[in-house]
């Protein structure tokens, strides 16, 4: 990879976007950003609070602006929020400004990885988490597929192994 292309990680919550993104950025000596963490840094509040106060629409507006700004940078790895792909503008920007890697995982792995995480506003509802994750997958998986340049299944692999797979795929392209 002679020139450093932006790498944008998309996929459902619990797929490993943040963990794998940090590993990937470290291995490639690139700057890492996480859109949810960037929202928290700028608002001084956690994502759950932003959701509670501004609703999902307010949160998505913030997310779209931050992703637009971050994708204008060069040589970054960006872990996006699972729902960021709901915005056509965001999908277009991700596709146009870098390589989009879809980190795919099963509902079972998502449940295992998110069960104790209270920072997931869409899971802090009365519906059973499995039903919520299945509904989100039905809505979002086609959008991830639509913009993915590369798709990698993360189920039983370490962040380092997945990062190496991404690097190998990028070197071939």
Curated annotation (Swiss-Prot):
Needed cofactors: Mg(2+)
Binding site for substrate: 36, 60, 82, 140
InterPro entries: P-loop_NTPase, Shikimate/glucono_kinase, Shikimate_kinase/TSH1, Shikimate_kinase_CS
Reactions accelerated catalytically: shikimate + ATP = 3-phosphoshikimate + ADP + H(+)
GO CC terms of this entry: cytosol
Principal cellular location given in the protein's record: cytoplasm
Pfam families according to UniProt: SKI
Cofactor comment text: Binds 1 Mg(2+) ion per subunit.
Single GO biological process annotation from the record: chorismate biosynthetic process
Gene3D superfamilies named among the record's database cross-references: P-loop containing nucleotide triphosphate hydrolases
Enzyme Commission code: 2.7.1.71
PROSITE patterns, per the entry: SHIKIMATE_KINASE
Subcellular location: Cytoplasm
Function: Catalyzes the specific phosphorylation of the 3-hydroxyl group of shikimic acid using ATP as a cosubstrate.
Similarity comment: family membership: Belongs to the shikimate kinase family.
SUBUNIT field: Monomer.
Protein name: Shikimate kinase 1
Lineage: Bacteria, Pseudomonadati, Pseudomonadota, Gammaproteobacteria, Enterobacterales
